[in-house]
Amino acid sequence: MDGEEPARRRRSLRGGIRSASGIGVVQASLSLVVQASSFDTMSDLVAPLRPKRKKVWVDYFVQFRWILVIFVVLPISWTLYFLTYLGDVKSERKSFKQRQKEHEENVKKVVARLKQRNASKDGLVCTARKPWIAVGMRNVDYKRARHFEVDLSAFRNIIEIDKERMIARVEPLVNMGQITRVTVPMNLALAVVAELDDLTVGGLINGYGIEGSSHIYGLFSDTVVAYEIVLADGRVVRATKDNEFSDLFYTIPWSQGTLGLLVSAEIKLIPIKEYMKLTYKPAVGNLKDLAQAYVDSFTPRDGDQDNPEKVPDFVEGMVYSATEGVFMTGRYASKEEAKKKGNVINSVGWWFKPWFYQHAQTALKKGEFVEYIPTREYYHRHTRCLYWEGKLILPFGDQFWFRFLLGWMMPPKVSLLKATQGEAIRNYYHEMHVIQDMLIPLYKVGDALDFVHKEMEVYPLWLCPHKLFKFPYKTMIYPEAGFELHRRQGDTSYAQMYTDVGVYYAPGPVLRGEVFDGAGAVRTMESWLIENHGYQPQYAVSELDEKSFWRMFDAGLYENCRKKYGAVGTFMSVYYKSKKGRKTEKEVQEAEQAHLETPIAEVDDDEDDQPAD
């Protein structure tokens, strides 16, 4: 958009408000969206482009939701965080033998529970985790049908940190805050550490996980060395990329736990240093200019993508408007380097510090600058404000007085935000708020920014690159055919460079009180992704029908493994698990029976599912 009025609209959104990547932290975050007076503080928009929307009762409930958050959600959240911390410390003090013994006993309980299931009478297998606990945008409607519960709540221990093999063996409910608290003092870390403390290993593997180091190591699941899985028949198997269960190993990511129950994972560790040297680079121009500045920040134009001298350890971008963005690159630095005279150390983890996305935005005024951030604080830089969703949850949460007095209780626990809302509120958020990640080839990032601006008008946008590897098997997500021949900027012979365009916040029309079709916007986005070989992480609300779902993702290897390992008829298929809306037991059972009786439809030839030579 190039006119004067759109330019004012872009400037009005510059105050920076954004939502959590990947994650569905924002189901309760529209507490400010219905306050027209609050909009004026963020926007001087004029002449709305769409008809005004009539208010409904939910608008008024959401308008004052911050009261519930401050007096109920935040205190309970802090208490739960503290109790969880005490439990984690207790676990860490146990010996390896104790943790291993507990793990083996808990696995036996899972096997025994599975064997109690009567396939003719009981529903499909689901975990006993309550729907509101999951850190995701979906309503988890599949658990509203009759189902057979298996309790995995005991699987939250770090079993072992093996410094010789550089492997962390962990259980699925171990979260990012827990594992960095253990590994960072050892100058070790997972190769990919998702930003938010509450994100669990199981969710990042079975679903989707990304971080600023993914342009080197790929998605979170790409850093896993082995999975320990309980199959439908109760067998416990260890799947690696080169053993007899290699097909299962490559199928687990993105499967949403529909092939078996993950009970532990062995994940790659890397050596790190005490600080992150972070460079903030502002960029101005149109969206194509911003896209190229982002690409140039971490991809050498000579194609030398594997050269650590030319490629930073961490990359992140934030597009604050259609004309402004800030791109950050980080490199690990020693304590000695950070404390040299003249260097600036910024401990962003203190509760009273400015929220990170707002701090980064200052580069637009003061120009490029460099600072050193303690490594663990850098990893979790977006936790306290949930990217920029904190601004919607608590409209005054970024003010110094609030940060100083109550910032130590932030963030509100996502599970409690979800637990304190009903179905009508959840559906309201689905229509009035966008929480989506668009994974697209890096060379199309400019087109993606253009698309989001025209269809949703959401700012800020979060940019994070990741490698999409070419595997021996064709997995649910895979690179474009022939990418290695084109060798576009960022690509290598073994991986195509993709990027996440994180779209989290209330769209411009909603902020202006105009009519907005949230479901329609998501459908348009999904069609655009399919046409551009992109992917939609399944934590988000999806409008895809089954045919379109399997146009976006590849079904071949997944369905073969479902049948081979007995998951059909025991675990719900990934489409039905991610499908929007309530599923009846009859609907799910009929779908499962159809898979048992008919061959796989509309998938690639069998040779695509065999190991490459």
Per-region residue spans from a language model:
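Noncatalytic alpha-helical scaffold of FAD-dependent oxidoreductases
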Residues: 2-613
